[in-house]
From Swiss-Prot:
Principal location listed in the UniProt entry: membrane
Protein name according to UniProt: LPS-assembly protein LptD
Membrane in keyword set: yes
Localization terms from the record: Cell outer membrane
Residues spanning the membrane: none
Organism: Methylobacillus flagellatus (strain ATCC 51484 / DSM 6875 / VKM B-1610 / KT)
Amino acid sequence: MKIRPITFLVALVCLGFGHAHAKDTQDTNVIDPSPENLPDPDAIIIEGDKVQVYLDRRLKSIGNASLSTGQQKVHGDTIEYDVQNEELHVIGNVRLETKGGRITGPELRMKPSESIGEMKKPAFELDSQFANMPQFGTSGNRRQDNDNLVYSSNSTTPLTQQNIEDSGYAPGLSRKQGVSRGDASGVVFEGPDRKRLKDARYTTCEVGSDDWYIRAKELELDDYTRTGTARNARVEFQGVPILWTPWINFSFLNQRKSGFLAPTWGTTSRSGFEFLVPFYWNIAPDMDATIGTRFLSKRGVQFQGEFRYLNENYQGTANLEYLPSDSSTGENRYYAKFAHLHNFHNGWTAAYNLEKVSDDRYFSEMSTRIVTTSRVNLPQQAYVNYADENWTFNALVQKFQTLDGLNYPLQRLPQLTLTGDNEWGPFDVKLFTQWANFDRNNDAISTQATLGGGTLDTLVTGKRLVAYPSISLPMARPYGYITPKLGLHYTQYQVDNGAFTLRDSNGNITSQDEYQSQSRTLPIFSIDSGLYFDRDVRIVKNRYTQTLEPRMYYVYIPYRDQSLIPVYDSSISDLNMGSLFLENQFTGQDRINNANQLTLAFTSRMISKNTGEQRLAVTVGQRYYFADEKVYLPGVNPRSGDTSDIIGEITARLLNNWNIDIFGQYNTDRSVYVRNNISARYNPEPGKTLNIGYRYTEDRLDQINLSGQWPLGKGWYGLGRWNYSLRENQPIEGIAGLEYDAGCWQARTVMQRVSTATADANYALYFQLELGGLASIGQNPLKLLNRAIPGYTSSSLIPDSYQ
């Protein structure tokens, strides 16, 4: 018989004052107290098919029995509650529900007021508490790179953000949550938030699938700190122990906690077998550190460390690596990086970024990542910034460590920049000013390569002052705009060590002179204008808005002889759709082209009427010259012809999940393509992506790039990339791998080949086993795959509906 709830407190009152009129046992359908007499926090509610009240202050519920308190609820076949001793005994089909999950078993004894007791042979389910744990053995907020702990380009990542080396995440997708279940021979409840399980097992696999689990002699769970501690624990995969530890401590929900991270291992052709053991130290809520020992079979033992700190007003990192007496070279080798960013408020900020390595071959020999092996100049710089609504100020001190021994960037010791922007009635007034002191590294050589294939021998240094005020009048309407602009560019040079010698590609001297201290003043006039037209069109059953957007940009700058002005920071801008609309074709301040030129460009777009999404954009542009080029860089021949190359861009987002991007630069005088970039991606759903790319730059680059991820059936995915240089007839990077998703665990193995700056290529082998987000064992290739295969999605993130 289903009855309404009764309340222990009122039942106690009835038993205490009405026992003279009661029988030894009393069957009752309901005891209905007055609600105002029931303090909710202390209320214990019992219900069942049959409830019995005993004179010795015991309550018994039989059939569909349950007992509820403010923190937990117990179900069972029979529930007995001793009012006087506050003891609970539940027999048969016991189910205990708490804020952390559910525990079931055959029998439970507990003191609800203190949440102490025990249960035999429990089985437990946790409310996804363990999902997304970063690494086995800890939940330190820690990212592990493929090579080490500290090659992190993002030195400003907040300490509260999950920093795991898992770049397989995709927008709009989240990691599949495991059921987080387990069992034990017994559990002891040691308070409201503490449980101790004996001979426990834990897994995130579905019921009936025990592909992997953690088996621990003792497992402690603390719901208050959200941490767990296991002793004498081992990980078993497919019934085979693969990892053992005497003690592990971890967090339920990715809170940072001190402890050992999962060891990683792999092999490379340059360093041999690698094994990394990192330890995470949670020093304070705004401060942490990671210390690692990396064993390299061909080199020795490398020590690594990273220290991070985060405050409301500042943040920073310190990264160190040290390999004493490299077995391959006999040298002590190191890498160091220190970065800090400080916000002083009121618009003021400051930062420094310092990097240094022991030798030029450090990255090419110690790293497997192509973005690292190709590094040439390491910054050693600091700056102070100020910004408000109208003004910005920057003070920069900058040096570099150059690793290739060829091109040494000039040092800025210091560089001061002040810019202003304000409205004056309908006019827009701007000011750019800069003073810089250029110096050279003591190791710098005088010979520098030129764009023309020759060399420029010089050790010129000096100081430079720039002032460029300008005024413009923006005028805009819905159908178009026009903006005339007038400016005056002033530059002053104080030159030291001005002697230079220019040689052609055969080594013959073509020019020999000396840079002079001088000043240069140039007026600059430009008009930027554009129109906007649109119409509605229908293609098949789809409605679009088609636009036509012509743009015209005119620039006039008179000629000034600049051949004896040193080149501190100027180079030629790449010709693209953006640079077609620049006043000066040179970057930096040392060269300002003479100009009497007009740029014409046309853009047409197809925009969906239903979604507003741009489906197609086509842009074509060209610059027309009305004066010969008289200003150019040393070793570079002046432009011939009265038009620039034609620039074209196409961006298409097709309805069948194809994305296509095309860039082309065509020289009309020689009827040849100077540059082509073509990329196409087919990405119909997560886990399916194919990429085809081609890059060509005349006399410099000719590469094809193929990559993809594709399901092979029954949870298997194929992975690959092939980047090949047609110019050198050799591969640049090759990747081949397999990935398997079993639902509660994933495995992936990847082989990588990377061409380095030296003649020999570097090979790396990755193997990783992910156990339901709890354990990540092996060397993590996810960042590599995310970079190498655009559109890649980790199998742990792919919804079941796509598999």
